[in-house]
């Protein structure tokens, strides 16, 4: 009887977990859809900035966006604040460590800026001397304005670095996300194939492009952030879907075990009743 009660408690516990994982799966799916919409809008915005930059002298644009040496490198690492998303954070940490090894083999000075706590927690003990800052609570970033404020709150001056690279999990589809690197500084503008319009700039186009360049770099970083967020939600959705399947299998096994135990208990009770009846006769 005690065994049956224990099995019932386990079944109740697994059912509770199953409800939680189902809700988390639905929430992750909804968040993924919202992030995909933001990602599409951000890419359109980036294309418009590219068109403006593309309309001016390429050599001058190159002077604004490029530096001659790449000795001092800043790696901006995108991860998450929460777990329950499969190997999402492990992949970016492994990718980052390999990237750091390659840079240090070329005698580069490497500094780290983290978006999200998970990668920071996993790398702190090994790279504490290279970490400039960590920006937790990335889920509070709801639009580009909040993202800019988030970046400025880091206190890191990107212009002090010869090379700035953002490392993130790129979202290709719901079945494919993988670690990628996007160079921010120096930045090569992807020229649009659309027809170029002629512009007149006040005071000078170099002043205008210098201002636009910061917006372009922030947009590149924002897109990387959205790609990473989409990958996180997708990974969590898949992880919760897998957890749902596992809980379903476990419930089937527990139900079978419970029925067998209950049947054995009933059989034992019947044997005792029959034995008692026969002893009376």
Swiss-Prot record:
Keywords: ATP synthesis, Cell inner membrane, Cell membrane, CF(1), Hydrogen ion transport, Ion transport, Membrane, Transport. Belongs to the ATPase gamma chain family. It comes from Ehrlichia canis (strain Jake). It is a peripheral membrane protein. F-type ATPases have 2 components, CF(1) - the catalytic core - and CF(0) - the membrane proton channel. CF(1) has five subunits: alpha(3), beta(3), gamma(1), delta(1), epsilon(1). CF(0) has three main subunits: a, b and c. This is ATP synthase gamma chain. Produces ATP from ADP in the presence of a proton gradient across the membrane. The gamma chain is believed to be important in regulating ATPase activity and the flow of protons through the CF(0) complex. Its main location: membrane. SUPFAM superfamilies: ATP synthase (F1-ATPase), gamma subunit. One of its GO terms (cellular component) is plasma membrane. GO terms for molecular function: ATP binding; proton-transporting ATP synthase activity, rotational mechanism. The gene is atpG. One of its GO terms (biological process) is proton motive force-driven plasma membrane ATP synthesis. HAMAP family: ATP_synth_gamma_bact.
């Amino acid at each position: 009887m005690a065994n049956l009660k224990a099995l019932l408690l386990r079944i109740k516990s697994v059912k509770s977990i199953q409800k939680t994982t189902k809700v988390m799966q639905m929430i992750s799916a909804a968040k993924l859809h919202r992030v995909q919409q933001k990602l599409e809008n951000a890419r359109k915005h980036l294309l418009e900035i590219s068109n403006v930059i593309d309309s001016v002298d390429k050599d001058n644009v190159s002077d604004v966006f490029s530096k001659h040496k790449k000795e001092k490198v800043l790696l901006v690492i995108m991860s998450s604040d929460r777990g329950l998303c499969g190997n999402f954070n492990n992949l970016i940490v492994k990718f980052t460590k390999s990237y750091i090894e390659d840079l240090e083999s070329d005698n580069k000075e490497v500094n780290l800026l983290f978006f999200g706590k998970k990668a920071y927690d996993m790398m702190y003990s090994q790279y504490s001397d290279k970490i400039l800052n960590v920006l937790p609570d990335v889920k509070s970033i709801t639009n580009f304005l909040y993202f800019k404020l988030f970046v400025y709150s880091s206190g890191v001056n990107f212009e002090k670095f010869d090379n700035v690279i953002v490392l993130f999990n790129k979202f290709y589809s719901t079945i494919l996300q993988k670690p990628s690197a996007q160079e921010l500084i120096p930045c090569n503008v992807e020229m649009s194939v659309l027809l170029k319009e002629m512009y007149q700039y006040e005071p000078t186009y170099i002043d205008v492009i210098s201002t636009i360049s910061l917006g372009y770099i922030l947009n590149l970083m924002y897109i990387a952030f959205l790609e990473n967020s989409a990958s996180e939600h997708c990974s969590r959705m898949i992880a919760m879907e897998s957890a749902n399947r596992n809980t379903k299998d476990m419930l089937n096994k527990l139900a079978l075990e419970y029925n067998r135990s209950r049947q054995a208990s009933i059989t034992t009770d019947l044997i005792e009743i029959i034995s008692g009846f026969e002893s009376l006769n």
